[in-house]
A protein has these predicted regions:
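Phosphate-handling substructures
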Residues: 1
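A conserved helix-loop-beta module that forms one wall/lid of the active-site cleft
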Residues: 64-75
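Active-site core segments that coordinate phosphate-bearing ligands/cofactors
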Residues: 4-36, 41, 46-64, 81, ...
Length: 216
């Protein structure tokens, strides 16, 4: 959608664009390497052929996005290259650093939590509350589609992941702060305290009956 927005609303920028990159491949490019996007992250663009592990010519054709405007793709953990000495010296890194592809945040978190087998899952709390299960085979059914559940490459080659999430994590706390906590924000700025510490000071010991359903 973001690429199409540029194509439809900023056609001059679109025509001058060399590559559309995500975070991992942009960092690779800035480190002087030919960028490669992990299958895990590329799937989130909705332009990856998940089963074949490469860009979908059919989807790119429908969108009118040339394949050469996207980076190469590879499995997570694929070696991209070694940071050139000149770049390493310029930014204060030791020479000889090897860079590899990464992955989408939730499957990467699952890997870090030791979720390596089909049928296992990790529960993560951050911007959102998210459950990320791992599968042995690619599976999209009427039930998963109805539940808005995706299936895409995990950060472990040969396995797949899904994500079930709700916007009740840190993003909801930020919304509350920005919407209702103007006085607390001023107090935090004056005292040097964290605004969330000030908010926590006013929280009663027992849960309240008021609930927020973040469907907005």
């Amino acid at each position: 959608n973001k690429v199409l927005w540029f194509k439809q609303n900023q056609p001059d920028i679109f025509k001058r664009t060399w590559k559309f990159l995500c975070y991992e491949d942009f960092v690779q490019h800035r480190l002087g390497l030919d960028p490669i996007m992990s299958h895990s992250l590329a799937a989130r663009t909705m332009a990856l052929d998940v089963r074949k592990g490469g860009w979908s010519d059919e989807l790119l054709g429908i969108a009118g996005v040339p394949r050469e405007m996207l980076p190469r793709t590879a499995a997570s953990g694929t070696v991209v290259g070694t940071v050139p000495d000149s770049v390493a010296d310029d930014i204060g890194l030791p020479r000889g650093i090897v860079v590899s592809t990464g992955g989408h945040d939730q499957p990467a978190g699952a890997l870090g939590a030791g979720i390596l087998e089909s049928g296992e899952a990790v529960y993560a709390t951050g911007t959102v509350d998210c459950i990320c299960p791992i599968y042995k085979t690619y599976s999209v059914t009427e039930q998963t589609v109805a539940g808005n559940l995706c299936c895409y490459p995990s950060c472990v080659p040969g396995l797949y992941a899904s994500i079930a999430f709700n916007f009740t994590g840190g993003s909801l706390l930020k919304w509350y702060r920005d919407t209702f906590a103007a006085e607390e924000c001023r107090s935090a700025a004056e005292s040097g305290r964290d605004v969330y510490e000030i908010l926590c000071d006013s929280v009663p010991a027992a849960p309240e009956k008021l609930l927020i359903l973040p469907h907005f």
